[in-house]
A protein has these predicted regions:
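Hydrophobic, aromatic-enriched interface-forming segments
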Residues: 115-123
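Short, linear, compositionally biased motifs with a strong N-terminal bias
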Residues: 10-13, 35
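N-terminal signal peptide c-region/cleavage motif recognized by signal peptidases
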Residues: 16-18
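N-terminal, motif-rich segments that launch catalysis or mediate targeting to/interaction with membranes
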Residues: 20-114, 126-254
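Bacterial N-terminal signal peptides that target proteins for export
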Residues: 1-8
């Protein structure tokens, strides 16, 4: 797996692609929302390491990081290329008093990358249940003869990477933030009290994947409305990604 490289650039000159955990604007919104929940000390620590605020971190795609869970949805992997393992190592480096500034900078970028990736259901693999990408056919309820009208081929990963967000194609990162602030009002305190637990985060993603797999099966023909009803899983993952990233940084950049 090639990891994502990052570059810190001016906020409105963000370099990104739409082939990351989510679309470029959504990824941008995740780090911007996380930044809103950083302490002043953490914001300063991020800027010292990166030379720029968290919200100006750009993603340059070289591949997506995945995490694998066992068939029950437990994270027990020791694979050095697994996103959870990479995140745990990055956290250890950020907490190490002997790490150099360059090592800490690299670890911070990896931590941002992996935290975002393990919250996107497209990057979740589950033994015997979700071992690879698969095709899904979406349609509306109209039929012509024996054929579904406007049947569209998509796939599991695309649903979570893009489908929900392309329906909000005109949304900017700031517009996402406006919605998320309303949707998560009063939640910050509970997130703040949680421990930094990458494996628990991945397991929560797996639980959501299991729910989605009840509807989205390989080569299934699914009503558009059924896919739309699963958007709440994606929304919850986005909120988690932002709050967990903020919590991680607040507790490791001391």
């Amino acid at each position: 797996m090639k990891s994502l490289r990052y570059i810190a650039v001016a906020l409105f000159a963000l370099v990104a692609t739409d082939a990351m955990a989510w679309t470029s604007e959504v990824n941008r919104a995740v780090v911007m929302f996380a930044e809103e929940h950083l302490s002043k000390r953490t914001k300063s620590g991020v800027e010292q390491l990166l030379g720029a605020p968290l919200s100006s971190v750009g993603f340059v795609n070289e591949g997506k990081s995945k995490t694998r869970l066992d068939e029950s949805g437990k994270s027990v992997t020791t694979d050095e290329k697994d996103a959870v393992v990479l995140l745990e190592k990055a956290i250890a480096t950020l907490e190490s008093e002997s790490a150099t500034a360059e090592e800490r900078k690299s670890a911070l970028l990896t931590a941002i990358d992996m935290t975002v990736d393990i919250h996107c259901l497209a990057n979740i693999l589950i033994d015997k249940h979700l071992e690879k990408n698969f095709a899904i056919f979406c349609h509306n309820s109209m039929q012509i003869g024996f054929r579904y009208y406007a049947k569209k081929k998509t796939n599991w990963q695309r649903v979570w990477h893009k489908e929900y967000h392309t329906s909000h194609g005109a949304f900017s990162a700031e517009m996402y933030l406006y919605d998320w602030r309303i949707a998560t009002k009063g939640m910050a305190k509970a997130y703040k009290a949680e421990p930094v637990a990458p494996r628990k985060w991945a397991e929560q993603s797996a639980k959501r994947a299991f729910v989605a797999l009840g509807t989205l099966q390989p080569n299934a023909v699914v009503e558009n409305a059924e896919v739309a009803r699963l958007e709440y899983l994606n929304d919850a993952s986005l909120y988690d990604a932002s709050f967990h990233l903020a919590n991680l940084l607040n507790k490791t950049l001391k």
